[in-house]
């Protein structure tokens, strides 16, 4: 059979719409063919090129070919640097723009300055995924050493606007947003308090005008505590002044001076109390519960009590003999010196702590100024750990293993250690340690107890069954054959000697999680449905007529059901 080859495809009818579309597409393709003809000429060598190949031809003399004396390299560089070059090959709509269509006209001639249009002034163009000239064959942004045209200025502005330099603080706190890091910081830095609030908090005024117990002082000790030292105390020949304490045992002339000093102390305390009470009346501060009348009454009480004690102390001092007064005066001077030594020691410790806090606050201010302070510390500044000067000197020792430069005090090391702890706790919580499934745990514990209670009756029943029936007459069903497990592999003699009745004890001693409900050897773990192994129950009791399903909530029905199934008649050979 000779068939003529049709002029069009067999699956396309002659008068179908698809055929018309094909003809239209072919005609459209034929109409576009003349657009790719070589309608351009090089103004130097007068060779014919297409509109795209002419640019590549001129670019050859800028980068690859050497000057041949025919093509003007400087003129070509000036022309090619001011044109708008095409971008990616996948961009659509570039070839059909009005500027492109106008450029294809026959009236356009290749001339210097007219080949490419200048970019629009004021327009900001962002180009992403710009291919290189190795991929497209078109070289962009050709520099011109002679002058600075519009194209180079546009390229410079484009490079400035295209690359966005993010500040360092934009990504500085990225690690603080990590939950593990935040938890590690919480464990590493346990104490976080508001240092700024503590530094600006006002102190409560003293409840007493004196910083000592005036009722326990003698007259010479009151003179040493309330009166100032003589101005000429450190001179060659010191002498007392009328308002200072004496260099010899005090007498009756110092009674009025001490009385005036007591009243001055109480008046100063009352003035401080009144100023504090007026400051508390400002809005935003909680009141201290003091008013002017209460302060005045308290000041009067302190004055009466202090003056009364002063009179009693002076009477006792005046009744002593001169030798006893001299010894008591020397003793009070020694006590005053010892008190000042203790006070100096306490003040030194407080000064060291204040200096440490000042250094920490200064470092915090520097970090805040340079935007290096973490966000968490801005909310909860860390507390200052008071370190005695002796401990600080030990830490600064060069040979010490606990110096600040030691790796054990490194921030990254401490945070990494606690981060490992946090991740470990999280992984353990996800796995289930401490968060186990209660129904599954109850199921396994109940099954273990049931198997422990039913082992002696089951073994006795199986022993009587094995003695009454020969092993060859009643082969065990396939579903009751023991699965290959660690217990059977350890005792192969027991499995080979008891072929008829060893399957039941092995199935009972084997955990239900290690047996398959299907026949044959175990391939994978059985799936528990609603906390019970239904396949195991049906396979272990093939001859039971009543449904003896295992209930996870009734633990007492397990031994009876298993004993009934174990002591039942073995399956007949004809089944």
UniProtKB/Swiss-Prot annotation:
Task: Write out the biased-composition intervals (Low complexity).
Answer: 455-471
What are the boundaries of the UBZ4-type zinc fingers?
39-66
- Please list the residue ranges that the record marks as compositionally biased, kind Pro residues: 472-485
Top-rank taxon: Eukaryota
**Gene Ontology terms: cellular component:** nucleus
UniProt entry keywords in alphabetical sequence: Coiled coil, Metal-binding, Nucleus, Transcription, Transcription regulation, Zinc, Zinc-finger
Subunit comment for this entry?
A: Interacts with atrR.
- Name it: Transcription factor ncaA
Q: Name the species this protein comes from.
A: Aspergillus fumigatus (strain ATCC MYA-4609 / CBS 101355 / FGSC A1100 / Af293)
